[in-house]
């Protein structure tokens, strides 16, 4: 059996506010106009004169939750770019245990009426070898707390996963799976993907069951949010 390596992702659904870039001291504009270098030399000005110093973060439109379709508001905390650098672990009876890194991007599509989030994930080994990629969509079943994830994977699998949202957590359970005819991985019988958001960190765990092995943890990883 070769590496399946599906991304895992449990979360807190607290509505965030988009941070405004402003000066907290009314004298900032005068200070900076008379001495531009003060933005680098003086800690007080650097901290309290962000607008005048031009130290405002750049918000990418695809991560700006003010653009989010109302139906998707309960999962707004998923939106962003998440990276786990050497924080992933792969285990399964048929392969050696090893560490990996992964970047997940969950973004808002351009169309205002599109009721799903774009999802991509890319994993690589400690020596930068490409291990696994997948892409798909995340949405919510109308008038429920059921979250749906669809994926197309670089190893030839296609999945439909659904699960309830409880507080900080989503637990996706495999509902349907497709595979190309010549894929050599062992037949996947079941899959459970768990995502948890904990104070700005995204913890992920994926458990799988094959025809010859019971349900057990296959991958786990801790992501840090890298987008603004």
Which residue stretches match the model-derived regions?
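Short amphipathic alpha-helical molecular recognition features
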Residues: 37-41, 74, 130
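Amphipathic/hydrophobic helical signal segments and adjacent flexible N-terminal regions
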Residues: 2-6, 54-116, 122, 127, ...
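Compact disulfide-stabilized, cysteine-rich extracellular microdomains and processed peptide cores
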Residues: 2, 8, 12-62
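Mixed-charge, glycine-accented linear interaction segment located at domain edges/termini
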Residues: 182-228
